[in-house]
Amino acid sequence: MAENSTQSGYNIHWRRNLAVCFAGSFSTLIAMTLLLPFLPLYVEQLGAKGHAAIVQWSGVAYGATFFAAALVAPLWGRLGDLYGRKLMLVRASFGMAICMSLTGMVESVWQLVLLRLLIGFAGGYSSGSTILVAMQTPKERSGWALGVLSAGITAGSLVGPLLGGMLPPLIGIRATFLLSGAVIFLAFLATTFLIKENPPAPKAVSSAKPKSGWAQIPDKRPVVAMLTTGMLLAFATMSIEPIITVYVQQLVADQSKVTMVAGVVMSAAALGTILSSSWLGKLADRVGHWNVVVGALAVSALLLVPQAFVTDGWQLIGLRFLMGLALGGLLPCITSVIRHNIPDGVGGNVLGLSISAQYVGQVAGPLAGGFVGGHFGMRAVFLGTSVLMALGAVYNWIVQTRRARHMLLEAGES
């Protein structure tokens, strides 16, 4: 049993590994997103003066982590292929625990930005968990397993800001960072002692120059489609963020409730994703991951149109929740399609590229959303994002159709 599982690429301990990765990703995402509600206050405490400077430094400090993570994600994926993916999780959790604890001890804004960069370089627990689960779970269960993991990641990013609003008044901002470091250290211990990984497959000795991970992919079209779709998903999701609060101001009569309604709007999509991700992942295992990708993109494109014309904040909340339900299966399906179309030995390398593409979308989305909203109006952001999602659905349908036709022709010739 163990031998067969190793040869087929999955691990007989995959359920336990999934549970540890779920708990570890949930806890590390909580710790990583705790700072969102109080980051501007911390920046002000560190010496930033004036509203513009506080906002600017807060944006730089927050974005620094994503920028650094986008640069190194393929590297960590490649090293995971060579030396083991568990080792990458141990490295990430230990490095994040140290850097997060040190963040509570900084004395200047520059030190804060530097540590946020280091967290991005050293971190990547949730992305590493995605790679480990994708590569060591039976392929026929990968959609469900990745859906469960995605729910944990999304739940952590949803709970984190809520706790971040509660803890600083009770224990202080600096102590909150130290507590975050302690939580991540617990994830480090669980990862070290509980995760069991198949050893990396031995490499055949050859005098020929080894091919890069990308060169070893027999059919690159599905992988390119999923890299593009992952970037599009992150871009579309984040493009709305800069305008939500201002948009809600136009919808809510009682201006004292603007921040509350805006917070619910931002959380509604995440809640929908949590509820649907494992179910859609399981559905994709039955009906095909491509079908769920195309359907999710098409439904989200349709749901974005009425968001541009709502007249009440609760209408926007309902539509964002439905959109979260539709998008819940996208990330698990993207990872599963890539997993099904690459050799086992390059999984970390290619999935690292996928994670980098998503980080690019996370950085570019808010920039584009803010620019379009400022120059063409907020409705244009929703409508423009709808067009992008529709184009993504059409693109994936074309790639899927051509690939299916090509496979039929190959089967007929053989």
Which residues does each PLM region occupy?
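Juxtamembrane intracellular "pre-TM" segments in multi-pass secondary transporters
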Residues: A2-W14, E197-L227, E413-S414
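Paired small-residue
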Residues: C99, W110-L118, L303, W314-L322
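Symmetry-related core transmembrane helices of the 12-TM Major Facilitator Superfamily/SLC fold
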Residues: A175-T192, F382-W397
